[in-house]
Amino acid sequence: MSINLSHLKKLIATMIPILIAQVSTVGMNFMDSTMSGHVSANDLAGVSIGASLFLPIQTTAMGLLTAATPMAAQLMGKKEKESIPMIIRTGLYLALLLSFLFALLYYLLIDTVLEGLSLAPAVSSIAKDYMLALVGAFLFEMLAMPLRSLTDTVGATTISMRLFLLALPVNGLLNYAFIFGKWGAPALGGVGAGIATLLTYVFLVLLFLAVILSHKPFMGRALFSSPESRLFVWKEYMALGIPNALGVFMETSLFGFIIVFITKFGTETIAAHQAALNFSGIIYMIPMSCSMAMTILVGYEVGARRYDLAREYSRLGLLTTLTGAAITITATLLFRQEIISLYSTDPAVIALGSLFLVYCAGWQLFDDIAAPIQGILRGYKDAKVPFFLMLIAYWFVCFPSGLFFDYVLSHGPESYWQCIDLGVGTSALLLIGRLWWIERKVTRD
């Protein structure tokens, strides 16, 4: 395959800012945990529990709202930019609805859920109050999603990158103020991290609004001059967003189930598993960023009916992530002990975590194929079939095989890393087949 350097540069220019914005978000979460841990173990535990309960709700809602990106990208490709404000406006309405539902869930279920976890009273209290702050943060985080889709597709991904980079130090300063009680703020410990997150997302939404309203290409006046939304836009959000959201929930819930089976192997195994899993999550930001870039670039070309260019960007995206995989896999295998030692000094944890990272290397390879293809398919507005393919890979291949490796073959805790490799590998193969079918279909049509 010959490489068009101008298209490769455009891909990199779209992907790198997304990656930097992702790193900024991870940095905010990192500061929440580390600063809370400097107050007390109870504060760290409360924040960790609250964040764990919040994550599946957060990622599922984000999966639903990401439908705005391929919708807007295809409209840009069709030269129907004037239709984009209604897409974004509907996304804002959907964000408000999701925020109301989350607040209702919190009000009805938080006490029952925390009681079921049998936590120490101090930890339970911190987790409850931390999540109350996250109810407010959730509203503004969800409102930021459609606004980001607008700036990413109509403008450039460098805009959201700059805004997230501005939000990162603000989050750090707010954490310092509200966790430790500095500059006249109350010392709230771990709960202060939730307040800081809320205020940071308020700041971020204000930044997005300032950019959109002050730059004519973003059609800020058209976006807010009318409350109009139409049923067909809601239907398209549901058609694209629900499979995305269910796919994200399915994946996060799978890892939640796996940790339940890992716990029987003891504290050191749990620590090793979490360390390796955390590292793999950091590495996953690379293919995930490429996936998001693919949705924008492929969606634009599909909207313009330039299917040959959509196919070219698809190949360039896969080439980019596989090149990155060669580097990250090599580094993971060569420095696996050093990587785990960043998380723990316990020799048993380092030994077992290093073994898990060998499986993580295989996982990285398959993720660097599967994630970009998911983004490509979203660019084609193909969401329902990929969801069912992921359902097969994760819940009909991955999870049962983990139980088989553990309870029948007695592979121990390695069973669940082996099954992840098998599941992600299966998803990569199935998604390759789906992409091949979609590309042939649009060419025939």
Q: What would you call each of these model-derived segments?
A:
Residues 2-34, 38-39, 52-71, 96-103, ...:
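N-terminal transmembrane alpha-helices
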Residues 44-107, 141-160, 259, 272-336, ...:
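Small-residue-rich hydrophobic transmembrane alpha-helices
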Residues 65, 134-152, 160-171, 193-209, ...:
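Short runs within selected transmembrane alpha-helices of multi-pass transporters and secretion channels
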Residues 13-32, 133, 137, 167, ...:
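Transmembrane helical elements of multi-pass membrane transporters/channels
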Residues 23, 27-45, 114-121, 177-188, ...:
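Helix-terminus/linker motif at the lipid-water interface of multi-pass membrane proteins
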Residues 1-15, 72-137, 185-242, 298-363, ...:
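Short alpha-helical transmembrane segments in multi-pass integral membrane proteins
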Residues 24, 28, 32, 36, ...:
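Alpha-helical membrane-inserting segments
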Residues 18, 22, 33-34, 51, ...:
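Transmembrane alpha-helix boundary and packing residues in multipass membrane permease domains
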